Amino acid sequence: MSVIDDVLEANELYSRTHGLRRPPPRPARKLAIRKCMDARRSIRTLGVTTGDAHIIRNAGGIVTDDSLRSLLVSHYLLDTERFMVINRTDCGLMHASEEELRTRIQNRTGTADIAPAFFFAFQHIEENGRHQLQILSTHPCIPTDVSF
């Protein structure tokens, strides 16, 4: 059985046993967390459980157009009032450059036409975290009553 089959089977079992007890789509803690995709960290390490918060993940915990879209949907359609940005202190994007990532992709695929155009590699975690918060706090579509 493949890893994908294992995950699908676990999801089917969960759906059968928890189907009627699913939490509502609006997060109970009115919180949206913008987080890195690090597989080593569970949301439970934050004291957050299923139904508490929207967890929006990507490489580096970067506020990209797509993650911003998710945060706006979280706020305007699902009533979150607080946004949190969490970066990992040993983030993989701190150990690579844009050029290195492009070269790896090109070497593996043979194509120079690489998407996404940017991977947003960075060197300093604190500076990156401040930059992500600045993007959110100054965005014209995020109201001033949203806390960070």
What are these regions (language model features)?
Residues 53, 85, 146-147:
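Residue-level detector of family-conserved "landmark" positions at structurally sensitive sites
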Residues 1-29, 61-63, 73-78, 93-148:
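Divalent-metal-activated hydrolytic enzyme cores
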Residues 78-88:
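Ordered, amphipathic secondary-structure segments that act as subunit-interaction surfaces
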Residues 4, 46, 83-84, 132:
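Homeobox/homeodomain signature
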Residues 17-69:
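Conserved beta-strand-loop surface patch within small alpha/beta domains used
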Residues 38-39, 89-91:
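Short glycine-rich anion-binding loops that position phosphate/pyrophosphate groups of nucleotides
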